[in-house]
Amino acid sequence: VRSACADVRTLVEAGAEVVVVHGGGAAADRIGVELGRPPRYLTGRGGRRSRYTDADALDVLRLGILGRVKPDLVVTLAGMGVSAVGLSGVDGRMVTATRNRPARATVDGVEMVVRDDLSGRIASVDPTLPRTLLDAGFTPVISPPALSDDGETLNVDADRFAAALAVALSADWLVVLSDVPGLLRDRHDPTSLVAAAPADLLDEHLELADGRMKVKVRAAAEACQAGVGNVVLADGRVDSPVLAACAGAGTRFVKERHARAS
């Protein structure tokens, strides 16, 4: 995290406008275990697994994202001389979402119709607040949750949140960091990197991805197709991960199929 924050400082000092988007699921999981409220997951049709976010789980998730991860990032950036401001999608109605409909899923080995899941899909992004902060020389540090039209707080995926925000801000770059070198043809072989991934071949890329990587790939492809010029899925574990991604590391998503790399 410190290395990525140092990259943010370097970019800001060079005159770039940077928005940091983060999640906090891992921190929330640890807090939940500490509180005796460990995370639970839904397995829907097709085997897709997602966080079960009932009211209690949403409270824990907010503790992790807004109470632990965000303050740590803001303080780290501030210590490096970056004027960071912490926000969530709820602030200024920045990000609105549509709540997921009741659906049949398996929870704790039991199949049921889930009606109390407070998760949703992003419906709109208003970039006014982050744009105002950027114009004033601040670096926004933004995360879920989002807000429904009815005023409910909803959990949304942080990677797709980042993609939607990048599109709304007409960003030149979107760098999505992960714990692998990028999209791999063989997930067990870190040297099997897909260097260039045409966004119109999303289904093929999703077949290569597994677990959380599927969401990251989908988010990257969506941003690319919506006009973000440079979209990279890269390794967040390396030194200077953001600068490395901008210099060519990781998987770059491109619009043109003829740019496909083997």
Predicted regions and their residues:
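C-terminal catalytic "cap/lid" subdomain
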Residues: V1-S262
